[in-house]
């Protein structure tokens, strides 16, 4: 039934992680099940120089479809305080990584480098200050160069919040 009715989850969300216990001893106190914590796991792995592996091609994982009736107003959690707090704990919006940001894939029972694509190349350039130089400021600058309209909108929103 999963093969017939199921659909692949979008790359922004990751639900399963396998890692040595010693890797994430400094994990912030995230609200698990809300946005941000899974993205931080990918970011943290890349920042620490660890292999971050996408197992999607080799591992079939079933994620149950559900609604959000258990949340206030039955709305998705993306605009709820717990999600905003998760993003803050993660270090801000630039640390929200997704499957595009992994550096290996588990495919045909072998670890392989992520195949080359221009999208991946430019994303690696964009995140270079975050994962190699460990500079959030330069990460923000690079984000602004690659996404000027989004960066401008974020800037305008931050000014509105201050007023």
Predicted regions: what is each one?
Residues 31-162:
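C-terminal catalytic/acceptor-binding lobe
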């Amino acid at each position: 039934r999963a093969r017939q009715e199921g659909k692949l989850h979008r790359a922004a969300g990751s639900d399963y992680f396998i890692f040595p216990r010693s890797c994430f001893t400094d994990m912030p106190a995230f609200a698990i099940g809300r946005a941000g914590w899974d993205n931080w796991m990918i970011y943290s792995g890349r920042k620490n120089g660890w292999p971050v592996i996408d197992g999607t091609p080799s591992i079939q994982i079933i994620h149950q479809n559900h609604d959000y009736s258990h949340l206030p107003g039955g709305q998705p959690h993306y605009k709820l305080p717990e999600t905003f707090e998760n993003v803050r704990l993660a270090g801000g919006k630039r640390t929200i990584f997704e499957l595009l940001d992994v550096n290996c894939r588990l495919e045909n029972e072998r670890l392989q480098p992520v195949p080359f694509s221009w999208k991946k190349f430019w994303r690696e350039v964009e995140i270079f200050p975050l994962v190699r130089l460990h500079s959030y400021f330069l990460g923000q600058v690079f984000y602004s160069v690659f996404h000027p309209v989004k960066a401008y909108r974020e800037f305008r929103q931050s000014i509105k919040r201050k007023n």
